[in-house]
Curated annotation (Swiss-Prot):
This is Large ribosomal subunit protein uL2. The keyword 4Fe-4S does not apply. It comes from the Bacteria. Residues 219-277 are annotated as: Disordered. GO terms for molecular function: rRNA binding; structural constituent of ribosome; transferase activity. NCBIfam families: rplB_bact. Keywords: Ribonucleoprotein, Ribosomal protein, RNA-binding, rRNA-binding. Residues 256-277 have a biased composition (Basic residues). Part of the 50S ribosomal subunit. Forms a bridge to the 30S subunit in the 70S ribosome. Pfam families: Ribosomal_L2, Ribosomal_L2_C. The gene is rplB.
Length: 277
């Protein structure tokens, strides 16, 4: 997907870049697949901030995405490629032979008019958009939209340019190399889709101005070293003095590379940790 630049009629637009919309079908979204989700602004039910640096952003409707791919044995045709304001990849509108329509994450190479399917037992052609259980996918295949628990829906490799690779099979598990580089065992009964998530150039765009992040619901982030000691462990000092300690969160928890993940039962499924991250 091509990256486009803008005429610099303001200083903020001089270095701003965006993604071309040539691949988007000129067609309205399906109303039955749109729902309103009230913006939390990072607040909980008591109105207190539980996630900092968030706001409502631009008004948008949520697109209901089929992450489970349970339409077994029924072929579907790609009717449209659409923009989704809730995620950084494109979505594809699939029209099935029984008349139902669903949105899925669009992988690279999936275009209007293509036919895809999903199956619970047996294998399908290894082509972008087809979905099947991991135990039926050949070793070495690139996949996305991977389940961690059978029937729960895809949780892994869903963002723009994301993918994982099937590295091996052993009894009821398969070995998958995650997008982070981590090697992990996943139950062979879990579903996955073939291909790489599209819109891989998303990582290369330049935001260009603060307002563009505000549209996305991202508020400014104040450095801890610019605060007073009462507000942050890095605060205080004369001038731009360093904090004199390893980087921590406002609540004193180690950050910037320090491992904070608690031990879990699923740790035994991780074969090797990610490297170079």
């Amino acid at each position: 997907m091509a990256i486009k630049s803008y005429k610099p009629y303001t200083p903020s637009r001089r270095y701003m870049t965006g993604l071309s919309s040539e691949d988007i079908t000129a067609k309205p979204s399906v109303r039955s697949l749109l729902v309103k989700i009230p913006a939390s602004g990072g607040r909980n039910n008591n109105g207190r901030i539980t996630s900092r640096h968030k706001e409502a952003g631009a008004k948008k409707l949520y697109r209901i995405i089929d992450f489970k791919r349970k339409k077994f044995g029924i072929e579907g045709r790609v009717e449209a490629i659409e923009y989704d304001p809730n995620r950084n990849c494109r979505i594809a509108l699939i029209s099935y032979k029984d008349g139902e329509k669903r949105y899925i994450i669009r992988p690279n190479g999936l275009n209007v008019g293509d036919v895809i399917a999903s199956i619970d037992e047996g294998a399908l052609d290894i082509k972008p958009g087809n979905a099947m259980k991991l135990k039926f996918i050949p070793v070495g295949t690139i996949v996305h939209n991977i389940e961690l628990k059978p029937g729960k829906g895809a949780q892994i490799a869903r963002s723009a340019g994301g993918y994982a690779q099937l590295m091996g099979k052993e009894e009821k598990y398969v070995i998958v190399r995650m997008p982070s580089g981590e090697m992990r065992q996943i139950l062979a009964e879990c579903m996955a889709s073939i291909g790489v998530v599209g819109n891989e150039d998303w990582a290369n765009i330049t935001i260009g101005k603060a307002g563009r992040n505000r549209y996305r619901g991202i508020r400014p982030q104040t450095r801890g070293s610019a605060m007073n000691p009462v507000d942050h462990p890095h605060g205080g000092g004369e001038g731009k003095k360093n904090s004199g300690r390893h980087p921590v969160t406002p609540w004193g928890k180690p950050t910037k590379g320090a491992k904070t993940r608690r031990k879990k039962a699923s740790d035994k499924l991780i074969i090797s940790r990610r490297k170079g991250k």
